[in-house]
C-alpha cells in the first residue's frame, strides 16, 4: 500500500491546535498590537491605583500616630484610678467631726475647743427640768429651818425640838444645863378649860402649876413632863 495522505480536515485540526502554524508576520503584528493595547490599559490602571496608595499611606500614618496613644491612655487611666483610690482611702480613714464641720477632720473650732467650752455646751444642752440631765437639788441650797430632815437632824429628847445634826452637840449642852423651870403651885378656884398635857378638864379645886409663861397644868402632869423636858409644852423655844 502507498503512504497515507493527509486530508484537509486533518490539516485544519492541526492548525487549530498548533500555534506554530501561524505566520511569523501575523504573530509579530499581533504581538505589537497586544503590547500597545496592554500599555494603553496599564496607564489607567496605574492611575487608578494611585488614590489607593495614598489612602494606604494615610492609614499607616494614622496607625503610627495612634500607636503611642494607647500607652498614654493606659497611663492616664492608671493615674485616674490611683487618684480615685486615694480619695476612697482618705474617705475611709477620715475622722468624723463631732460638730459636723466641713472637711474630713472637722472644723478648726472643734479642734481648738477648750474643756471649759465643752462643759458650757453640756450645760446649755441640759434640760431645765429635774430629770436625770437636769439640775440636781443640793442640800445646802435650802435653809436649815426649812428642811432640817435633809441634814439628818434629830429630835431632842429634852425639849422635843428637831435639831440639825451639825447643831446637835451645842443644843444638848444647852438643854441639859438649862435650869428646870420653876412654877407656882396653886389651887384652881374655878373651872378653866383643859390641860394641854392630859387633855382633861381643869376643874375647880384641882392642884395646878402656874408656869412663868402663865400656862397652867395639872401639877402631876407638869411634874411628869419635866422629867423628860425642860421647857413649857406650849412654848418649847423659851
Curated annotation (Swiss-Prot):
Encoding gene, per UniProt annotation: Znrf2
Subunit note: Interacts with UBE2N. Interacts with ZNRF1. Interacts (when phosphorylated) with YWHAE.
ZnF locations on chain (RING-type): 195-236
EC number in record: 2.3.2.27
Domain of life: Eukaryota
Functional note: E3 ubiquitin-protein ligase that plays a role in the establishment and maintenance of neuronal transmission and plasticity. Ubiquitinates the Na(+)/K(+) ATPase alpha-1 subunit/ATP1A1 and thereby influences its endocytosis and/or degradation. Also acts as a positive regulator of mTORC1 activation by amino acids, which functions upstream of the V-ATPase and of Rag-GTPases. In turn, phosphorylation by mTOR leads to its inhibition via targeting to the cytosol allowing a self-regulating feedback mechanism.
GO BP annotations listed: positive regulation of autophagosome-lysosome fusion; protein ubiquitination
Protein name, per record: E3 ubiquitin-protein ligase ZNRF2
InterPro entries reported for this sequence: Znf_RING, Znf_RING/FYVE/PHD, ZNRF_ubiq-protein_ligase
Organism: Mus musculus (Mouse)
Pathways per UniProt: Protein modification; protein ubiquitination
Sequence segments annotated as region (Disordered): 1-137
Gene Ontology CC: cell projection; cytoplasm; cytoplasmic vesicle membrane; endosome membrane; fibrillar center; lysosomal membrane; nucleoplasm; plasma membrane
Amino acid at each position: 500500500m502507498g503512504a497515507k495522505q493527509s486530508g484537509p480536515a486533518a490539516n485544519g485540526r492541526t492548525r487549530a491546535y498548533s500555534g506554530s502554524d501561524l505566520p511569523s508576520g501575523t504573530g509579530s503584528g499581533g504581538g505589537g498590537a497586544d503590547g500597545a493595547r496592554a500599555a494603553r490599559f496599564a496607564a489607567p490602571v496605574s492611575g487608578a491605583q494611585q488614590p489607593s496608595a495614598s489612602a494606604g499611606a494615610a492609614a499607616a500614618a494614622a496607625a503610627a500616630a495612634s500607636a503611642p496613644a494607647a500607652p498614654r491612655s493606659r497611663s492616664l487611666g492608671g493615674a485616674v484610678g490611683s487618684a480615685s483610690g486615694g480619695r476612697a482611702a482618705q474617705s475611709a480613714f477620715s475622722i468624723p467631726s463631732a460638730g459636723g464641720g466641713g472637711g474630713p477632720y472637722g472644723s478648726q473650732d472643734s479642734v481648738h475647743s477648750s474643756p471649759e467650752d465643752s462643759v458650757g455646751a453640756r450645760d446649755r444642752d441640759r434640760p431645765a427640768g429635774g430629770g436625770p440631765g437636769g439640775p440636781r437639788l443640793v442640800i445646802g441650797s435650802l435653809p436649815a429651818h426649812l428642811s432640817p430632815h435633809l441634814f439628818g437632824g434629830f429630835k431632842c429628847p429634852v425639849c422635843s425640838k428637831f435639831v440639825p445634826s451639825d447643831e446637835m452637840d451645842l443644843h444638848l449642852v444647852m438643854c441639859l444645863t438649862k435650869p428646870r423651870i420653876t412654877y407656882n403651885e396653886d389651887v384652881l378656884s374655878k373651872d378653866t378649860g383643859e390641860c394641854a398635857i392630859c387633855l382633861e378638864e381643869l376643874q375647880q379645886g384641882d392642884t395646878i402649876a402656874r408656869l412663868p409663861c402663865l400656862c397652867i397644868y395639872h401639877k402631876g402632869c407638869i411634874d411628869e413632863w419635866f422629867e423628860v423636858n425642860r421647857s413649857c409644852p406650849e412654848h418649847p423655844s423659851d
